[in-house]
Amino acid sequence: MGLLIPMSMPLSGAALRAGALEVVVFGGHLLLYPTGVCQEKVTTRPPATRPPVLLLHGFSDNRSVFVLLRRALGAGGRHVEAYNYSPFTLDLRVTARHLARRVEELCERTGQERVDLVGHSLGGLVGRYYVQRLGGDTRVRTLVTLGTPHSGTRVAPFMDAHPLIRQIRPDSEVLTELAAPAPGCATRCVAFWSEFDAIMTPAGTARIEHPDLCVENVQVTGIGHLALAAHPAVIAAVRRTLEGPGLAAVTGSDTASVA
């Protein structure tokens, strides 16, 4: 989950602070993890006035990783739910199809035509596959990804026996599908990435590089992989992103930063 800083990364003061913060966040997440194991209870609520937000956790994780982000979005008046996909999933594409059904159910229940998705790590890739390959751009207004291996990651090669891990390697079949043309994709994509994200190897692989997508890549400084889902600066930036326009006027990869 990103506890260690690779030896190739300079041990600057910023890197050490990011590593220390990651340890603190990891400890807090361990305490909260049991609270997110079960699916949340879905309650009937009045129709939403804005697109609901659906949160997607990462590999071997659960909805507890979003406790702070969810609280902040809810305080801003958004209807927020989390989708716990199976920790035993072996194929990202199957999970994306399950997500499609979950989105349809959420739209029907809230009376909204579109939703916003926020995915941490693998969850962002599940959301992107749904948007690009399963027609999800007709339902997803904005896709926000936090530390997602859009170009694949080479971390932990000893885990290659796991089919899902092989799918997030550079040039995998899934990533090749996502690199294919996606003309007319109607979803705005915002990718948050950090140079101190030890899970994303090489650094910058969490950027989205695709000529057909409306993309903004946001660099976050001094934050590790797990902290991307919990740091106040990132949470504030995600909240602003979801309050912004549904689709920018131009496509391409632009870069912003969060200090």
What is the predicted role of each segment?
Residues 92, 223-232:
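Catalytic histidine-centered segment of alpha/beta-hydrolase-like enzymes
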Residues 229-243:
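Post-His helix in hydrolase/transferase enzymes
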Residues 69, 201-208:
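Short alpha-helix in the alpha/beta-hydrolase fold that links the catalytic acid
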Residues 83-86, 217-224:
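Short glycine-rich catalytic loops that host catalytic nucleophiles or stabilize transition states
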Residues 194-201, 225-226:
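Acidic catalytic loop of the alpha/beta-hydrolase fold
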Residues 49-51, 183-189, 212-216:
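Short, proline-enriched alpha-helix->beta-strand connector loops that line the catalytic pocket
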Residues 54-59, 63-64, 68, 74-186, ...:
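Serine-dependent carboxylesterase/thioesterase catalytic core
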